[in-house]
Amino acid sequence: MSIELNWETLTTGPDGEELAHRIRDFIHSKFQTVPLPRFIKSVTVHDFQFGAIPPELELKDITDPLPDFYEEDPDVDYDDEDEDVEETHDYEERRSEAAASPARSGDDGLFGGQRGDGMNKLDRVASSSSSSVGRGSAPRPGAPPQTPTKSNININTRMRGEVPPQDLTSPFLGVSTPGILSGGTSNFSYFHSHLASSGLSGTQTPLAAVAGAQLGGPPQWNGLRSTGRGSGRRRSLAAASQGLDGEGFTPSHSRTSSTVSNADLQTASLGGFGGHLTPTSFLRSGQQTLREKHSVSTLAPTSVGTSRPPTRDLTTTMSTAQEDGQGGDGNCESSSAAAAGNEQNESDSSDRTKYRERRIEDMQAVFRIKYAGDVKLLLTADILLDYPMPSFVGIPVRLSITGLTFDGVGVVAHIRKRVHFCFLSPEDALAAVGSASGKEAGDGDEYGDTSGGAAAAAASSSASAATTPQGVATLASPAGAAPGSDEKAGGNTRMGGLLQEIRVESEIGQREGGKQSLKNVGKVEKFILEQVRRIFEEEFVYPSFWTFLV
């Protein structure tokens, strides 16, 4: 279906002049970024005119917009266009949130509805073992007598699963161990044996269970930096360790230094560890294990508020996992590998492109565009003379593009309040429009244009600029090529370049007998034509496209 375009309304008047000036400035800015050859000093664009001959438009198809048209630009605010801001979303992020919802519900149950049963068991065990924990351990010779201090109260409070309001950053906060929750004896022997490096394998002492005894609680309670990506590691490590039964343990590579006071360590050594583990030996025996394993918070006395880089944590985690795997701790190795994989997936998902929501009213029109008009582009180039020395003097050359021939396929998409426009490459245009019909098979090109052979020749890299005696340069086809000599394979014709012909007029110095006074003007013309073609193909041909607000 042919479409008549009111060319005069679009190109004349104040709006048409402003559009012409903007196109001129755009082409000039592009020439300033082009690396110039040695014999050209500079290129300046002075004027652009649309001409009086309009292009011919033929509607070929109406389809759904290309996916790239829905891609979000982080520098653009779409709130003015969309009535519902939440329509803009990331599909991958939605899936990750839906997958993480069971883990979040498990965390809520730990401190919510499931807390009642667990607390009943915990209270019974704590009440029966309070004497052994608080008073049963014989004091060490020379140690001060134990008195009910604030730290002892905190330890007993933590054993009952309660939250002491005065210390919300301790890694022992909200301790919950499998031995206590299952109704058995306390697993402080696990804790002490692991810190004393007794050599228990991962099958006897689950890594996540030991980590849970040290950390306890979700990340927002134990001083770790809580992020949305913790749910993926939670599921991987819980499946690898099988020691927490979904108690909401969340390891994290990016973490801040835990705050542990000497009073807490002293109380733990006197009450919870049998009275023979001092803070110094506690740090010496467990420093390497606690510092390097990704599932355990660091207890080393570092400055508060600092954090280790995630890259360094990931490297040390992988190296530690390999060492532990050689020593027989298979669960640690699998947990480290799972955490490393989740870390990579999360970094990829954060950089994943966001797309806008599709609507049923979005549409795209495919046009075939023919143009053989008198568009004008005026520019000057300073060429350098190398005599008597290199770059001795610069002479301005006036170049005028007086017309061009174009044949291609364009795409116009309307999405909300934006219009996207681009041309298709010859290969994409052939796929979008289809092969030649039987009626047009005998014509010069796919669309029945007898100048298709010249178009294909002009698109090749061997095209050159031929200068006539009148000073008009055009893109000529290479030797042996003739109009209408398109390449045909299997009955399908191949489209040529979009810009089939560019007419250039050059003026320099004084003319004698209709000849140019300088020989390298042809090189300047060839360079200008090649750059015009390159700018057009890079800026207007898909996947590059232009967006207009309507």
UniProtKB/Swiss-Prot annotation:
Primary location: mitochondrion
Record has Lipid metabolism as a keyword: no
Region (Disordered): 62-168, 218-356, 474-493
GO biological process: mitochondrial genome maintenance; mitochondrion-endoplasmic reticulum membrane tethering; phospholipid transport; protein insertion into mitochondrial outer membrane
Composition skew (Low complexity), residue ranges: 125-140
Listed InterPro entries: Mdm12, MMM1_dom, SMP_LBD
Biased composition (Acidic residues): 69-90
Topology of the protein relative to the lipid bilayer: Peripheral membrane protein
Gene Ontology molecular function, alphabetical: lipid binding
Superkingdom field: Eukaryota
Stretches of the chain forming a coiled coil according to its record: none
Domain SMP-LTD as annotated: residue spans: 1-550
Keywords: Endoplasmic reticulum, Lipid transport, Lipid-binding, Membrane, Mitochondrion, Mitochondrion outer membrane, Transport
Cell location: Mitochondrion outer membrane; Endoplasmic reticulum membrane
Database matches in PANTHER family: MITOCHONDRIAL DISTRIBUTION AND MORPHOLOGY PROTEIN 12 (PTHR28204:SF1)
Family recorded in the similarity comment: Belongs to the MDM12 family.
HAMAP family (alphabetical): Mdm12 (MF_03104)
Comment on protein domains: The SMP-LTD domain is a barrel-like domain that can bind various types of glycerophospholipids in its interior and mediate their transfer between two adjacent bilayers.
Name of the protein in its database record: Mitochondrial distribution and morphology protein 12
Source organism of the structure: Pyricularia oryzae (strain 70-15 / ATCC MYA-4617 / FGSC 8958)
